[in-house]
């Protein structure tokens, strides 16, 4: 199974970050650094777990490089970038 590591042409994605402590300011700083348009969508918290979801628009960027940037934030344990068509159900 092969995955393309470069995303192209203004597609919408969901950026899902999971971990013990997610600093929203640090996340938005990275998005601004890469000049990625974003909308905050959801934050779920439990005692020792947080999940934050952002809708992002990517042109042509190495997802590996972007993902590594989020892992520099202490407390982030998982980073997911998911294709998104604008609909959320469930």
Where are the regions that the model predicts?
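Canonical alpha-helical transmembrane segment with a positive-inside/aromatic-interface signature
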Residues: 1-45
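Short, hydrophobic beta-strand segments
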Residues: 50-55
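Short amphipathic alpha-helices in soluble, non-transmembrane regions
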Residues: 26-34, 62-75
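A general structural signal for short secondary-structure boundary/capping elements
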Residues: 60-66, 85-88
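Conserved short beta-strand edge segments in small beta-sheet-based binding/regulatory domains
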Residues: 38-44, 72-88
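Helix N-cap motif at beta-to-alpha junctions
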Residues: 20-21, 56-63
């Amino acid at each position: 199974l092969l995955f393309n590591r470069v995303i192209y042409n203004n597609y919408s994605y969901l950026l899902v970050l999971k971990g013990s402590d997610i600093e929203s300011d640090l996340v938005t700083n990275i998005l601004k650094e890469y000049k990625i348009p974003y909308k905050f969508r959801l934050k779920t918290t439990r005692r020792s777990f947080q999940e934050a979801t952002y809708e992002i628009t990517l042109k042509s960027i190495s997802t590996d490089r972007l993902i590594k940037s989020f892992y520099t934030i202490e407390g982030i344990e998982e980073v997911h970038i998911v294709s998104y068509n604008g609909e959320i159900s469930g």
